Amino acid sequence: MGHSPVATALVALSLAVLAPCALAAPGFSDTLIGYRYSDHYTDPGKTKDVAKNILQITHVSSYRLGQNFINLDVFKSDRNDPAKGGGTGATEFYLTYRNQLQYGKFFDKPLAFGPVKDVALTAGLDYNTKNNEFASEKRLLVLGPTLKFALPAGFLDASVLYAREWNHCGLDVCSKPGNHTDLLFDPFFQFNLTWGVPFTAG
């Protein structure tokens, strides 16, 4: 199964830019562009530390019925994590998208009880591709309820998500009889906590 990291990056960046524009309404909106570097990353099957340059683009926004979260990480490895065929380090793209459809915004009255101020339905996907020998192509879909807790300031969300993952193995061993290059994993549940609480240091 071939893939083009450049094409994938364009698709991912298009999602990151266009989805919020299509869904956003008056409310909050924030975008972060960041950069990270370390020469002490470890990858499965690698005996040496891997140096990686990482570009991050994150966007969060509200819209009439809920809110969006989009994150794209672009990883560029050194030669200790080579691209297929060698000569340069591998490049990986990892896109995460989550959308919340809030009960209170849909019905104009929150579903509140105890410490919970509202309930939402969360849906989303993870999309990954990497141009090394393994050639992973992760496709993850998630769906499930989210409890939105009332806090004096900030937010706290707890989600239970039903998840299903598809992936790809480009190694020669995966093409041998009895093995598979395209993989479908058993369904599983994700338990996610997301929070942001302001505080003052010093």
Residue ranges and their predicted role:
Residues 24-75:
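Short glycine/proline- and aromatic-enriched beta-strand/turn motifs that initiate or cap beta-hairpins
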Residues 134-202:
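Detector for outer-membrane/organellar transmembrane beta-barrel domains
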Residues 71-130:
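Surface-exposed loop and membrane-interface regions of Gram-negative outer-membrane beta-barrel proteins
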Residues 31, 53-57, 93-97, 139-145, ...:
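Hydrophobic, lipid-facing positions within transmembrane beta-strands of outer-membrane proteins
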Residues 37-41, 74-78, 125-131, 162-168:
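Transmembrane beta-strands of outer-membrane beta-barrel pores
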